[in-house]
Amino acid sequence: MTVAKSVALFAVAALFEIGGAWLVWQGVREHRGWIWIGAGVAALGAYGFVATLQPDAHFGRILAAYGGVFVAGSLIWGMVADGFRPDRWDVSGALICLLGMAVIMYAPR
């Protein structure tokens, strides 16, 4: 599997996990109802499936690396969905996390 395909899988996983969590948040905190919560739970389940498509056989490695994608993706989601404006420290932290993801997943072994 190419690095590009692996990165694409991480991006899809992030959409499902962050989107799912956001839908649950909207259903509970913003009182949008059970449909939103149910859609969020379904999206979170899809995230779990997408993670299994990564080429590495080690669950811990995949989830640890995905953590970096989750951090950066959450900031991007907040910008797009909620008008959040990250500061330079948010951006710096996200870049550090993405660097960590790249080392964990793609360093030669």
UniProtKB/Swiss-Prot annotation:
Signal peptide: none annotated. Pfam families: UPF0060. It is a multi-pass membrane protein. GO terms for cellular component: plasma membrane. It comes from the Bacteria. The keyword Thylakoid does not apply. The chain crosses the membrane at residues 7-27, 33-53, 62-82, 88-108. Keywords: Cell membrane, Membrane, Transmembrane, Transmembrane helix. The keyword Kinase does not apply. It is found in: Cell membrane. Belongs to the UPF0060 family. PANTHER family: UPF0060 MEMBRANE PROTEIN YNFA. This is UPF0060 membrane protein RHA1_ro06609. It comes from Rhodococcus jostii (strain RHA1). The lineage of its organism: Bacteria, Bacillati, Actinomycetota, Actinomycetes, Mycobacteriales.
